[in-house]
C-alpha cells in the first residue's frame, strides 16, 4: 500500500531529521495531509508581516468642516477624546469655535507574529540616523576650522589630510592591540610577570599548590614571599611601587590626551622630569590661587592649627568591644543623670518638689505643702500644718507632747552640748535617721499620743473621760 503524496510544499525530505521523528507511528491517522506535525522544524520563508509597523502621523482623508458629536473637544478629531489629545491645548476648543478641525487618525491593527514581536529593529526608521551623521560632520568641520585658526596653511593642512589614515592606523594599534593579537599571544606571560613559586626558593618558605594555584602554609612571619602575596592576583605594594604606578598612569594619560608621547620604559628619566615639573606648576598655581582668595576675602586665622582638631573623632582601626547594654567594656562608668530637670525652684519655694514626705504624700520641705506647683507659704504653711495636725491629738497630750516638727526645728536651732558630743562620737547614722531624721523612740511616742480620726473608740474614750 503506497503512501499519499504530500500536499504541503515544505515537506521535502530532510536528511538531518532521524527516521523515528520523520515517520509517523502506525497508530496515527494519515488522512489529514495538510496537518504537518513537523512544521516547527521546517525552514519557513520570510513573510512581509515581520516588517509591518504603525504608520506614524497618518490621517484619514480630509478634515471635517463641522464639529461632530463625540469628537475631541480640543482638536475635533473623532479617534480620541480630549484627555488623550496630543495637540496643543487651545483656549477655546474646536467644540465651541468650530475652526481648525483636525483630520481623524488612522487606527491601524498591526498583528505581529512570533518573530516580529521579538525583532528589536522592527519599526526602526533608518532616516533617523541621519542627524547623528550630520552631528559628526559638524564636529569634523569645527576641528578643521580650529586647525586653520592656529595658523596652519592650506598646504600643511593637505599634508595632514594625507597622513590622517596613517595616524588613525597607528592610534588603533596603540589603543586596541588586544583585538589584533591572536588568542595564543594574549595568553603568553610577559617578562615582568613572576610566578608565585619563584618568589622565594627556600624549602621552608610558603608552599605553592599547583592544583588550586594558591599559596598554602604561609610560613614564618619573616617570610617575605608570604607577606607579598596576600591573596589571589594581589601583590602588596611596598617601597616605590606606588610612585611607579603614579608615573605609569601619568604617561598613559598624557599619551591619551595627545599632548606629548611619554614612554616610561623607553625613557623613564624624561617622563619623571615632566611629571615632577607639571606637579610643581600645578602646586604653585594652587598656592597662588589660594593666596589671592585669602587676600581678597581674608580668613587666614581659621586655617591655622587649633587644639580642637586633635579632639576630633576620626576613623581609626582601634578595636572596641561592647557589652550587652551597649556600653564600651573597660570604660569608666559615669554617674547617670536624670532625664528630669533638677534643682529648679518654682513659685518662691526654697526647696524642690519631693523634698518632704508625710502620710504617703510628697511635698515641699519649705512650707509642708503637698500640692504640686503651688505657691510657697513659708513659715505660715508650716504653722498651719502643725495646727491641723494638733487637732487630732488628745487635749491632755497637747502640752505634754510638743509637735514633732517644732521639736525637730528647736533641736536643729539649739543643739545641746550632749547631742553635740553624741554626734561627734557616732560617725555613722542609722537608716531611719538618714531617711527622715526621726529616731525610733520619737516615732513610738508620736504613735501613742496621736489620735486616729477613723478610730471608732476615740469618741467612746472621750465620753468616759468627761
Curated annotation (Swiss-Prot):
GO terms for cellular component: spliceosomal complex. The keyword Zinc-finger applies. Residues 147-186, 395-450 are annotated as: Disordered. It is found in: Nucleus. It comes from the Eukaryota. One of its GO terms (molecular function) is zinc ion binding. Residues 167-177, 421-431 have a biased composition (Basic and acidic residues). Involved in pre-mRNA splicing. Belongs to the SLU7 family. This is Pre-mRNA-splicing factor slu7. It comes from Emericella nidulans (strain FGSC A4 / ATCC 38163 / CBS 112.46 / NRRL 194 / M139) (Aspergillus nidulans). The gene is slu7.
Amino acid at each position: 500500500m503506497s503512501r499519499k503524496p504530500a500536499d504541503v510544499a515544505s515537506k521535502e525530505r530532510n536528511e538531518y531529521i532521524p527516521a523515528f521523528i520523520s515517520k509517523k507511528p502506525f497508530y496515527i491517522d494519515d488522512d489529514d495531509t495538510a496537518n504537518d506535525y513537523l512544521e516547527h522544524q521546517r525552514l519557513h520563508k520570510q513573510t512581509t508581516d515581520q516588517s509591518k509597523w504603525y504608520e506614524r502621523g497618518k490621517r484619514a482623508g480630509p478634515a471635517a468642516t463641522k464639529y461632530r458629536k463625540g469628537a475631541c473637544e480640543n482638536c475635533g478629531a473623532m479617534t480620541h477624546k480630549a484627555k488623550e489629545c496630543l495637540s496643543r491645548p487651545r483656549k477655546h476648543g474646536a467644540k465651541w469655535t468650530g475652526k481648525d478641525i483636525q483630520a481623524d487618525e488612522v487606527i491601524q491593527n498591526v498583528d505581529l507574529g512570533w518573530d516580529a514581536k521579538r525583532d528589536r529593529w522592527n519599526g526602526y526608521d533608518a532616516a533617523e540616523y541621519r542627524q547623528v551623521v550630520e552631528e559628526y560632520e559638524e564636529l569634523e568641520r569645527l576641528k578643521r576650522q580650529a586647525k586653520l585658526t592656529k595658523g596652519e596653511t592650506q598646504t600643511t593642512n593637505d599634508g595632514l589630510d594625507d597622513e590622517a589614515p596613517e595616524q588613525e592606523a597607528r592610534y588603533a594599534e596603540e589603543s586596541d592591540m588586544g583585538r589584533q593579537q591572536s588568542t595564543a599571544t594574549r595568553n603568553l606571560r610577559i617578562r615582568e610577570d613572576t610566578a608565585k613559586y619563584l618568589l622565594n626558593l627556600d624549602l621552608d618558605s610558603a608552599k605553592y599548590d599547583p592544583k588550586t594555584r594558591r599559596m598554602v602554609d604561609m610560613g614564618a612571619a619573616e617570610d617575605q614571599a608570604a607577606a607579598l602575596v596576600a591573596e589571589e592576583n594581589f601583590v602588596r605594594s611596598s617601597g616605590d611601587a606606588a610612585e611607579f604606578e603614579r608615573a605609569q598612569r601619568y604617561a598613559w594619560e598624557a599619551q591619551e590626551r595627545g599632548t606629548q608621547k611619554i614612554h616610561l620604559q623607553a625613557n623613564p628619566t624624561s617622563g619623571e622630569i615632566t611629571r615632577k615639573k607639571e606637579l610643581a606648576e600645578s602646586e604653585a598655581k594652587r598656592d597662588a590661587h589660594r593666596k589671592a582668595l585669602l587676600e581678597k576675602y581674608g580668613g587666614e586665622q581659621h586655617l591655622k592649627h587649633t587644639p580642637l582638631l586633635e579632639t576630633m573623632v576620626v576613623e581609626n582601626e582601634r578595636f572596641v568591644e561592647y557589652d550587652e547594654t551597649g556600653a564600651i567594656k573597660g570604660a569608666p562608668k559615669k554617674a547617670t543623670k536624670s532625664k528630669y530637670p533638677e534643682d529648679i525652684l518654682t513659685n518662691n519655694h526654697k526647696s524642690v518638689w519631693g523634698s518632704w514626705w508625710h502620710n504617703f504624700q510628697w511635698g515641699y520641705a519649705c512650707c509642708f505643702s503637698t500640692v504640686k506647683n503651688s505657691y510657697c507659704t513659708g513659715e505660715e504653711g508650716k504653722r498651719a500644718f502643725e495646727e491641723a495636725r494638733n487637732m487630732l491629738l488628745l487635749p491632755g497630750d497637747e502640752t505634754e507632747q510638743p509637735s514633732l516638727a517644732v521639736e525637730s526645728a528647736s533641736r536643729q536651732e539649739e543643739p545641746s552640748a550632749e547631742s553635740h558630743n553624741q554626734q561627734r562620737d557616732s560617725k555613722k547614722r542609722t537608716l531611719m535617721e538618714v531617711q527622715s531624721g526621726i529616731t525610733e523612740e520619737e516615732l513610738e511616742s508620736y504613735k501613742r499620743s496621736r489620735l486616729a480620726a477613723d478610730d471608732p473608740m476615740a469618741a467612746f474614750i472621750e465620753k468616759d473621760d468627761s
